[in-house]
UniProtKB/Swiss-Prot annotation:
Known function: Atypical Ras-like protein that acts as a potent regulator of NF-kappa-B activity by preventing the degradation of NF-kappa-B inhibitor beta (NFKBIB) by most signals, explaining why NFKBIB is more resistant to degradation. May act by blocking phosphorylation of NFKBIB and mediating cytoplasmic retention of p65/RELA NF-kappa-B subunit. It is unclear whether it acts as a GTPase. Both GTP- and GDP-bound forms block phosphorylation of NFKBIB.
Residue span of motif Effector region: 35-43
Designated name of the protein: NF-kappa-B inhibitor-interacting Ras-like protein 1
Provenance organism: Mus musculus (Mouse)
PANTHER family membership: NF-KAPPA-B INHIBITOR-INTERACTING RAS-LIKE PROTEIN (PTHR46152), NF-KAPPA-B INHIBITOR-INTERACTING RAS-LIKE PROTEIN 1 (PTHR46152:SF1)
Binding-site residues, GTP: 11-18, 61-65, 120-123
Length: 192
């Protein structure tokens, strides 16, 4: 099992961040349950990666962002990964995800943080405000993976978190710098 990675779940108020986590982890979220505002909760999950290794995730369920309110900066300093959540029936929530991605890029080097995007409330697609093709095109241009999901179908939630855990548990790449006390490969003559 890995060291434990910190993943921040963020998005506008009422896009379903807590519902996603409760359905993913416990399989017991009730649709239509009265919304109660989250201050911040931390969930622990052991997620199997695509390599069969279990990765421990600390999932930070953040307070829903409101208009004009930014994600607190301390999240950028400790997060190993982000799950950006919008609602397919709320264009403003998608626009906020676009801004969050820019903020993450500004505060973290893209190469060291894993990001997945979830378009939630797919079951409300008749009220859709976010075009699926436009969202996927944006995700490709930002080099992030985007899924449209619904808490009514827990299976739609598993793949994004499996991919995230897999990205977070990838083995470190080997350094190209020679280590002290070792000879450089391919250079048997130190005089050259």
């Amino acid at each position: 099992m890995g060291k434990g990675c910190k993943v921040v779940i963020c998005g506008l108020l009422s896009v379903g961040k807590t519902a996603i986590l409760e359905q993913l982890l416990y399989g017991n979220h009730t649709i239509g349950m009265e919304d109660c505002e989250t201050l911040e909760d931390v969930y622990m999950a052991s997620v199997e990666t695509d390599r069969g290794v279990k990765e421990q995730l600390h999932l930070y369920d953040t307070r829903g962002l409101q208009k004009g309110v930014e994600l607190p900066k301390h999240y950028f300093s400790f997060a190993d990964g982000f799950v950006l959540v919008y609602s397919v029936n709320n264009l403003e929530s998608f626009q906020r995800v676009e801004l969050l991605k820019k903020e993450i890029d500004k505060f973290k080097d893209k190469k060291e943080v894993a990001i997945v995007v979830l378009g939630n409330k797919l079951d409300l697609s008749e009220q859709r405000q976010v075009d699926a093709d436009v969202a996927q095109q944006w995700a490709r241009s930002e080099k992030v993976k985007l899924w449209e999901v619904t808490v009514t179908d827990r299976r739609t939630l598993i793949e994004p978190f499996t991919l995230l855990a897999s990205k977070l548990s990838q083995p470190q790449s080997k350094s190209s710098f020679p280590l002290p006390g070792r000879k450089n490969k391919g250079n048997s003559n130190p005089e050259n």
